[in-house]
A protein has these predicted regions:
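Catalytic alpha/beta active-site cores
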Residues: 1-136, 167-170, 208
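Conserved active-site and cofactor/substrate-binding residues in soluble primary-metabolism enzymes
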Residues: 2-3, 24-31, 61-68, 94-108, ...
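Conserved, well-structured ligand/cofactor-binding cores
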Residues: 14-32, 44, 50-59, 140, ...
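Structured core elements
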Residues: 19, 82, 128-130, 168-171, ...
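Mobile "lid/hinge" segments at catalytic clefts and subdomain interfaces of large enzymes
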Residues: 74-110, 191-265
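Glycine-rich anion/phosphate-binding loop at the beta-strand->alpha-helix junction
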Residues: 106, 130-225
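Flexible, glycine/charged-enriched surface loops at secondary-structure junctions
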Residues: 115-126, 155-167, 204, 235-245, ...
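Catalytic-core signal marking the mid-to-C-terminal active-site face
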Residues: 223-315
């Protein structure tokens, strides 16, 4: 927070979207951003990054003053909440579990808005969604496409007009897919993941540095991470076509299957009352999935390049 003013020096806040990530000091960060912005309305897609449910999923507590933060968000023209699927993905959740969690968390925030008299149409504009993107290209494409379909259904049931059933979707390359051994392979993983997120309909993508599992990323890895999205947009033209995977039987089938599985997980969570009440049982199911995946890796039934396949014997 102390370095926020230095970080944003020279940034055109009405042009470049800014999203805060300050879970320990959300109010101080928001107040600092408001002071920097002054009378300027933030660019579309900006947000305060508040995610109390995600913090609960990670075993942390949120003491944010939501009422005061909501007032700042309204003044800045920024989104208040982020619905972050990486909170469960990083613990080993399957794609369906991540979708179910994101839907349930999103509905929880809609209810919080409704408790304060905000209608669903306006409330939906206060949310940003995040999904993890892995090197499993087609499942990642299908997951991003499925979320748009499922959230559209939630908004339909909430009475939101069709033309306003929009979704701001941000992709983050997966942390669990990264390997400490032969970390250069992580560049291939993150490139495929970023490509899949873009093809799946992400509005923006964060590419993690390839050496992040080793500690503080070096300048080369940070530069490569920043440039990956630019190369995919400017040279591969990923952003030129809307839904380029649409119509492909394989992708449509995967999307339908994931949408059904994600909705089933969502209804299972809702049957327990609310995402906060269902979180312990959801995390228990996530742990089971993670345990099975670890066993598959240990038995080489799930190969990892540079680790269990083609390892660098001199590393």
């Amino acid at each position: 927070v102390d370095q926020l003013e230095t970080t944003l020096a020279g940034v055109l806040l009405d042009v470049a979207p800014v999203v805060l990530d300050a879970p320990d000091q959300p109010l101080q960060a928001a107040q600092t951003l408001a002071r920097i912005a002054g009378e300027t309305k933030l660019a579309a897609g900006s947000g305060l990054g508040l995610d109390p449910i995600g913090m609960a999923a990670r075993g942390e507590e949120s003491h944010a003053d939501i009422a005061q933060l909501a007032q700042i968000a309204n003044t800045l023209g920024a989104r208040l909440f982020v619905v972050d699927g990486t909170a469960v993905h990083d613990q080993g959740a399957s794609d369906a579990q991540e979708l179910g969690y994101v839907l349930a968390a999103g509905v929880h925030y809609l209810r919080r808005y409704a408790d304060h008299g905000v209608d669903p149409t306006q409330a939906a504009q206060g949310l940003e969604f995040r999904l993890s993107a892995t090197a499993e290209q087609f499942p990642t494409i299908a997951k991003f496409r499925a979320l748009r379909r499922l959230w559209g259904r939630v908004l339909e049931l909430s009475g939101v007009p069709q033309e306003q059933r929009t979704l701001l979707l941000h992709g983050v390359t997966s942390r669990p897919m990264m390997a400490k051994y032969d970390p250069w392979v992580n560049m291939l993983r993150t490139t495929v993941a970023a490509f899949a997120a873009g093809v799946g309909g992400a509005d923006s993508v964060t590419v993690l540095p390839y050496d992040q599992p080793l500690g503080l990323p070096d300048p080369l890895s940070r530069r490569n991470a920043r440039n990956t999205s630019a190369l995919l947009i400017e040279e591969s033209h990923v952003a030129k076509v809307s839904d380029p995977a649409g119509g492909s039987y394989a992708v449509e089938k995967l999307t339908n299957d994931l949408a059904e599985a994600g909705w089933a997980e969502f209804t299972r969570i809702e049957a327990e009352g609310d995402i906060l009440e269902a979180l312990p049982s959801l995390l228990a199911r996530v742990a089971e999935v993670a345990q099975r995946r670890d066993a598959e890796v240990a038995r080489r039934r799930r190969p990892l390049t540079g680790v269990s396949e083609f390892p660098n014997l001199h590393e």
